[in-house]
């Protein structure tokens, strides 16, 4: 049974439009080096692997949250599904005492979580598993949302100097459309005592969103406008992110999130890709 969080989710994705909202940027200290992108080995190819996003709304004071943690762990051990999704944990249930909490996580849950914890939502929408946290329910939704080929491919490079993270992103369209790019910083291995934990691994929290960059749209969730791209077109954008002192950069990675405008003008997740800090991720071709 899900635990009702006594807050109101005031900004559901169903109500999200393309209205711009000014956001004060994070300012890194010191010089920010923007790394070079990896070479595209197949410039004429636009058949890209597709990954959906699983967004876990959770927190260390949530005694029911280990139920979803158990299902996500089991999902990660299914070879048929590991390449079909990226998992993000938004620690938003409690700000006090949760070392994985961040304002970025709170923004995500404000936008997409119904207010019940734990909850798993999909592709930056309010679509969720309902009352079931079973692995079979999650895989059924993955099967429904996953595509054989993505509408856009992602290549990226990330580097760190001090607390300054520099990220370089290139996207290549397989389908004509209007695209946006955002980058999120995820941290692994955060130790925090989990209410309701029955095993020690539940006290280690990974894929926790710690920071976001991507300008002004809806709390930075949807990202920077890249404009209209035709099939085969590429677009590039660089980002800088200031990492908080509480974030252990050596345990972090970058999730590149690309959203595409639908016929109603609202943005939906088109693809996402993980990039190691100090490394690169090349286009993932089928």
Residue ranges of each PLM-predicted region?
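Bacterial Sec-dependent N-terminal signal peptides
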Residues: 2-50, 282-286
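A generic structural signal for short, solvent-exposed coil/turn residues
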Residues: 10, 46, 54, 79, ...
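Domain-level signature for proteins that mediate thiol-based redox and metal-cofactor handling
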Residues: 14-15, 19-22, 44, 77, ...
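Short N-terminal helix-initiation segments at or just after the protein's N-terminus
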Residues: 24-33, 59-65, 200-201
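Local sequence-structure signature of Cys/Sec-based thiol-disulfide redox active-site neighborhoods
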Residues: 38-79, 83-85, 90
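Short, conserved sequence motifs used for protein processing/export or organelle targeting and
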Residues: 86-286
């Amino acid at each position: 049974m899900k635990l009702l969080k006594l807050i109101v989710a005031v900004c559901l994705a169903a109500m999200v439009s393309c209205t711009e909202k000014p956001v004060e940027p994070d300012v890194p200290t010191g010089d920010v080096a923007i790394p070079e992108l990896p070479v595209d080995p197949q410039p004429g190819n636009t058949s890209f692997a597709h990954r959906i996003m699983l967004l876990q709304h959770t927190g260390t004071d949530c005694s029911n949250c280990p139920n979803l943690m158990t299902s996500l762990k089991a999902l990660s051990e299914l070879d048929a599904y590991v390449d079909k999704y990226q998992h993000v944990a938004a620690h938003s249930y409690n700000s006090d005492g949760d070392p994985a909490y961040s304002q970025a996580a709170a923004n995500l849950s404000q936008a997409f979580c119904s207010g019940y914890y734990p909850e798993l939502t999909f592709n930056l929408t309010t679509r969720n598993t309902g009352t079931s946290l079973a692995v079979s329910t999650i895989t059924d939704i993955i099967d429904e949302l996953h595509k054989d080929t993505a509408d856009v491919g992602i290549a990226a490079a990330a580097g760190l100097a001090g607390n300054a993270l520099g990220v370089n992103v290139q996207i290549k369209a397989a389908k004509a459309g209007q695209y946006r790019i955002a980058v999120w910083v995820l941290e692994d291995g955060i130790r925090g005592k989990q209410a309701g934990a029955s095993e020690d691994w539940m006290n280690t929290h990974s894929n926790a969103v710690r920071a976001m960059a991507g300008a002004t749209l809806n709390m930075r969730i949807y990202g920077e406008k890249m404009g209209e791209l035709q099939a085969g077109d590429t677009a590039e954008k660089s980002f800088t992110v200031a990492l908080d002192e509480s974030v252990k950069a050596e345990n972090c990675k970058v999730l590149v999130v690309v959203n595409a405008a639908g016929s109603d003008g609202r943005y939906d997740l088109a693809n996402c890709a993980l990039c190691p800090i100090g490394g690169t991720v090349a286009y993932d071709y089928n």
